[in-house]
């Protein structure tokens, strides 16, 4: 089986919520592919497709949750191959969440997984997160960066609010801020004073490494 076929089989298993198949294919892929490639082009690719189908009303929340569970199991099976920081990082500590009023979770969850697999210590605080919770968690874990996702134009302002509260708390110089999500852009990131904008999970990893090097 070619690498492309392995990755496609993995993506299909995620879409079908077949956890046992995911684990079996991950084991096969371990000897041929890097963990980051297995996650990005296999597991995350499948989860992205689940997200697309969910947004179009073709899949429902229980299916999404089962697919996410299968992806989590796949990532856990790769833990022994991940960089030494993946479970207690020295690359940097990142708090990642989706702002209050926004219940979208899939894209943010994929970003968290990719960052963790790259060697960051990631604290995923979920979706629909109150602004202050981002700051409190950052203080608690001594975060180097906060990732703020917003998937709706109506919740985009929450990204700006997190940055403003960081300033009020005297933490802005210490904590980097990355923004992302469908309505976010580089221009928006510049406008609100974020340190960077990431269009996707792969870019998020690259930007985080660049900022926290």
UniProtKB/Swiss-Prot annotation:
One of its GO terms (biological process) is homocysteine metabolic process. The keyword Repeat applies. Residues 1-90 form the B12-binding N-terminal domain. Induction: Induced by growth on trimethylamine but not methanol or monomethylamine. Part of the mtbC-mttB-mttC and mtbC-mttB-mttC-mttP-mtbB1 operons. One of its GO terms (molecular function) is cobalamin binding. It comes from the Archaea. PROSITE patterns: B12_BINDING, B12_BINDING_NTER. The keyword Repeat applies. Pfam families: B12-binding, B12-binding_2. Gene3D superfamilies: Cobalamin-binding domain, Methionine synthase domain. Methylcob(III)alamin binds at residue 104. Residues 91-213 form the B12-binding domain. InterPro entries: Cbl-bd_cap, Cobalamin-bd, Cobalamin-bd_sf, Corrinoid_p, Dimeth_corrin_MtbC, Met_Synthase/Corrinoid, Meth_synthase_dom. Copurifies with MtbA. Acts as a methyl group carrier between MtbB1 and MtbA. Binds 1 corrinoid cofactor per protein, is subsequently demethylated by MtbA. Belongs to the methylamine corrinoid protein family. NCBIfam families: dimeth_corrin_MtbC, pyl_corrinoid. This is Dimethylamine corrinoid protein. It comes from Methanosarcina barkeri. The gene is mtbC.
């Amino acid at each position: 089986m070619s690498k492309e076929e392995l990755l496609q089989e993995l993506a299909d298993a995620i879409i079908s919520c077949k956890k046992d198949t995911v684990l079996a294919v991950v084991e096969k892929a371990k000897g041929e592919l890097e963990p980051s490639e297995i996650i990005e082009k296999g597991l995350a690719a499948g989860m992205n497709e689940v997200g697309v189908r969910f947004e179009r009303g073709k899949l429902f929340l229980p299916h999404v949750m089962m697919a996410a569970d299968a992806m989590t199991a796949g990532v856990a099976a790769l833990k022994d191959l991940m960089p030494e920081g993946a479970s207690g990082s020295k690359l940097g500590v990142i708090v990642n969440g989706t702002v209050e009023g926004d219940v979208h979770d899939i894209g943010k969850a994929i970003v968290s997984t990719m960052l963790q697999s790259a060697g960051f210590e990631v604290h995923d605080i979920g979706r629909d997160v109150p602004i202050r919770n981002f700051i409190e968690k950052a203080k608690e874990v001594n975060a180097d960066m906060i990732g703020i996702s917003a998937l709706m134009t109506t919740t985009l302002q929450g990204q700006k609010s997190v940055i403003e509260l960081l300033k009020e708390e005297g933490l802005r110089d210490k904590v980097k801020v990355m923004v992302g999500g469908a309505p976010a852009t580089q221009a928006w990131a510049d406008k609100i004073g974020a340190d960077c904008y990431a269009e996707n999970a792969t870019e998020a990893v690259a930007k985080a490494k660049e900022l926290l090097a």
